[in-house]
UniProtKB/Swiss-Prot annotation:
This is 3-ketoacyl-CoA thiolase. Its EC number is 2.3.1.16. The gene is fadI. InterPro entries: Ac-CoA_C-AcTrfase_FadI, Thiolase, Thiolase-like, Thiolase_AS, Thiolase_C, Thiolase_CS, Thiolase_N. Keywords: Acyltransferase, Cytoplasm, Fatty acid metabolism, Lipid degradation, Lipid metabolism, Transferase. One of its GO terms (molecular function) is acetyl-CoA C-acyltransferase activity. It comes from the Bacteria. Its main location: cytoplasm. The active site is at C99, H392, C422.
Length: 436
């Protein structure tokens, strides 16, 4: 495990998170039905620049991510530059790290600033579950390539004769992990059984998340970090997340059937995140450049870590591996944190990680530590609600977490906060921010 990180540039300046913004998050096929991830990305980056009153020519790089790729626009970052008011000379490239994608884009920009290669950049991510790349079967794809090479009508006819009716059916994007064949929901169900997570506890966490998110919106706490999004044909707009159960009642959660193991399961649609559309972004600068331009940053990056574990062994345990590494690099312990933001992909996954944070056995056997990461103080944990309520556009969640924890720390007078997430492929991400 790496020792303490020194996240300052050659002049001793920290990485400033100047501001962050996101679209409202919307359930699949609702407010953003027909709006691509690229269009949502352009929306949020344009608005972020506008609100920051920053000359676009000063932005040296955009690193942006997407999980559900658009074949027509594989480099979403560059398309955002070309499709907004940004200067065409702005460098741009795309990244993907499953549900930790915008953690990665943020770190990439931060590292470029740390090396002195630049001083101002934007990072973020966007995903649409409503505009999907619908593919074709392998046999049809093979046949289409052969058709392109065929010269005669007879050759083309023989190629068509190889196909059956089922080969002509469209193929939606895979929801299963490529290596295991398991969906994320099946993995969460597996974790619920491994760690004895009860249905009642899962439902209680989901109810808490929706209740806190409702209170957060009603208190106006998200006004600075969520934009109003106007969508074609521009007769309506969305300015609030539409997955939140504003009248959440705990007893109603018990009525839903298990979604992934019908007979013996406990993971339901109510204690899982739904397929979601949305985009988010953060503006990063060197501390000196931010102050020279008159900005008061919402926070600074103190440390970060990425980890990977076996996909066959409860692969959504990323926070339990990445968090202790980020804490060590920051020279901190869990109890030193003011706030903790953990991505709630599923209530089962979240509760399993929370359980392992407090497990000395897990720490000794899996982390090589002689003490547990620490028991989570619920008064610090996801205090504004989490992904179970807000939703989860895969590539957008990381920068939502980072922005949200910075703003809440600011409201509380400063401190340090953890943002952490699991990701497909057994990946994990954690970032510690400090706010003055």
């Amino acid at each position: 495990m790496s020792e303490r990180q020194q996240l300052t540039n050659a002049r001793g300046e920290r990485i400033a998170i100047v501001s962050g913004l996101r679209t409202p998050f919307a359930k699949q096929a609702t407010a953003f039905h027909g709006v691509s991830a690229l269009d949502m990305g352009k929306m949020v980056v344009n608005e972020l620049i506008s609100r920051s009153e920053l000359d676009p020519k000063l932005i040296e790089q955009l690193v942006y991510g997407q999980v559900v790729q658009m074949p027509a626009a594989p480099n979403i970052a560059r398309e955002i530059v070309l499709g907004t008011g940004m200067d065409i000379s702005t460098d741009a490239y795309s990244v993907t790290r499953a549900c930790a994608t915008s953690f990665q884009s943020t770190v990439n920009v931060a590292e470029s600033i740390l090396t002195g290669n630049m001083e101002i950049g934007i990072a973020g991510g966007s995903d649409s579950s409503s505009v999907l790349p619908i593919g074709v079967s392998k046999k049809l794809a093979h046949a289409l390539v052969d058709l392109n090479k065929a010269r005669s009508f007879g050759q083309k006819l023989s190629i068509f004769r190889r196909l059956g009716l089922k080969d002509l059916l469209p193929v939606p994007p895979a929801v299963a992990e490529y290596s295991t064949g398991l969906s994320m929901g099946q993995t969460a169900e597996q974790m619920a059984k491994t760690y004895n997570i009860s249905r009642a506890d899962q439902d209680a966490l989901a109810h808490r998340s929706h209740t806190l998110a409702t209170e957060t919106w009603n208190a106006g706490k998200l006004a600075e970090e969520v934009m109003a999004a106007h969508v074609p044909p521009y007769k309506a707009f969305i300015d609030r997340d539409n997955n939140i159960r504003e009248n959440s009642k705990l007893e109603s959660y018990a009525k839903l059937r298990p979604a992934f193991d019908r007979k013996h399961g406990s993971v339901t649609a109510a204690n899982s995140t739904p397929l979601t559309d949305g985009a988010s972004a953060v503006l990063l600068m060197s501390e000196g450049r931010a102050k020279a331009l008159g900005y008061t940053p919402i926070g600074y990056i103190k440390s970060y870590a990425f980890t990977a574990i076996d996909v066959w062994e409860d692969m959504l345990m990323g926070p339990s591996y990445a968090t202790p590494m980020a804490l060590k690099r920051a020279g901190m312990e869990l109890e030193d944190l003011t706030l903790i933001e953990m991505h709630e992909a599923f209530a089962a996954q979240t509760l399993a990680n929370m359980q392992m944070f407090g497990s000395k056995k897990f720490a000794e056997e899996k982390l090589g530590r002689n003490r547990a990461i620490g028991e989570i103080d619920m008064s610090k944990f996801n205090v504004l609600g989490g992904s179970l309520a807000y939703g989860h556009p895969f590539a957008a969640t990381g920068t939502r977490l980072i922005t949200q924890v910075c703003h809440e720390l600011k409201r509380r007078g400063g401190g340090t906060g953890l943002a952490t997430a699991c990701a497909a492929g057994g990946l994990g991400a954690a970032m510690i921010v400090e706010v003055e």
